[in-house]
Design a protein with these regions (language model features):
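Interaction-mediating elements
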Residues: 1-122
């Protein structure tokens, strides 16, 4: 059930590889050990001119990738740390960005607050 939003900051002349969303979904699904069709990835592109860091300019190789994860329950402690490390590594490899440019955020647990097909996630 994980839903993962990947927001890729791209330069003006950057071309996104065909199939990038599927490659990300496959890699993220393997990271979460999800059965086929159970991890959903939504890929969003953010133009470089719509992203900034205060008092700083970035080289194209430094453009970030923002990742937001929604799961039934959020892991804790070492399990969360390990999952973030694996997820950042997988996304870095697929996008060609350094792992230091991949930033992962976990949303609050979906249990009890999200519905699929009219059914509350328990």
């Amino acid at each position: 059930m994980p839903i993962v939003d990947v927001e890729l900051v791209v330069g003006g002349s950057s071309v996104v590889a065909p199939g990038l969303a599927q490659s990300l979904a496959d890699a993220v699904g393997r990271t979460f050990q999800s059965p086929p069709g159970q991890t959903w990835v939504r890929l969003h592109l953010l133009g470089r001119d719509h992203y900034a860091e205060n008092e700083s300019s970035l080289e194209p190789t430094e453009l970030p990738v923002f990742v937001k994860v929604l799961k039934r329950a959020v892991p804790e402690g070492a399990k969360l740390a390990g999952e973030i490390t694996q997820l950042a590594g997988a996304i870095a490899e697929i996008t060609g960005r350094p792992v230091s440019c991949v930033h992962v955020e976990y949303a609050p647990a979906a249990r009890g607050r999200l519905g699929f097909g009219g059914q509350l996630v328990e």
